[in-house]
């Protein structure tokens, strides 16, 4: 009994010890340890939007797509943005008088709401979490908007389709809008790699996820269009909508180029010349 009392009064530097099932005729007791227990830091409250428009009428949005992200319409059919779910186990049996201690049983599940941390090194689940997918979506969408505009503009001004632009540069030499450039193709490639690489390194050096996507300032918002929070939210929504449309549109450009070998303007003119007989169905059925 004295040993039991001494154990119960032991220092709690290494953890918290809970003593139970102590009887006067036995020195057996069950101990639970909580090593390094810390108070959980308060989490940011999420803005939950109810009755918001969804990607499909009558669709049910997943719990993790609560509308807090701009342009969130509850679309994630493959569950790619679903946060990791962890099993909670009870503590293993710690009775030294037993021949075999039993493992702790599963007592529940726990899902962590991952908040982006200001660190260049993040766990796998955070790097490929919902916030990371949004960053990739927006960056790819911006590139797609530039590519879509570039493909249409170049074909309109020069008649060269976007898929043949590289061939023309290799044969006729590097040029811009018909004007020759004093650089070879290999030199231009190195310039592009170095410039874009430097820009991407600088962007990823920003640890604040909001500033990494929307840097603002005199270089990226010289007119101060995002100074008003309400207008900023509207512009962010318009941008993500146009970005998604541009990604789908350029995918259509690629499919058209593979099927017909023509550019988007040429395909559009061909379709307008005979709308009833020049469609995507006719194109793939005749190929």
From Swiss-Prot:
InterPro entries: Chloro_AB-bd_pln, Chloroa_b-bind. One of its GO terms (molecular function) is metal ion binding. One of its GO terms (cellular component) is thylakoid. Chlorophyll b 3 binds at residue 200. Residues 1-31 form a transit peptide. GO terms for biological process: photosynthesis, light harvesting. Pfam families: Chloroa_b-bind. Chlorophyll b 4 binds at residue 203. This is Chlorophyll a-b binding protein CP29.2, chloroplastic. Binds at least 14 chlorophylls (8 Chl-a and 6 Chl-b) and carotenoids such as lutein and neoxanthin. It comes from Arabidopsis thaliana. The light-harvesting complex (LHC) functions as a light receptor, it captures and delivers excitation energy to photosystems with which it is closely associated. The LHC complex consists of chlorophyll a-b binding proteins. Chlorophyll a 3 binds at residues 177, 239. It comes from the Eukaryota. Keywords: Acetylation, Chlorophyll, Chloroplast, Chromophore, Magnesium, Membrane, Metal-binding, Phosphoprotein, Photosynthesis, Photosystem I, Photosystem II, Plastid, Thylakoid, Transit peptide, Transmembrane, Transmembrane helix. Photoregulated by reversible phosphorylation of its threonine residues. Chlorophyll a 5 binds at residue 256. The chain crosses the membrane at residues 143-163, 181-201, 245-265.
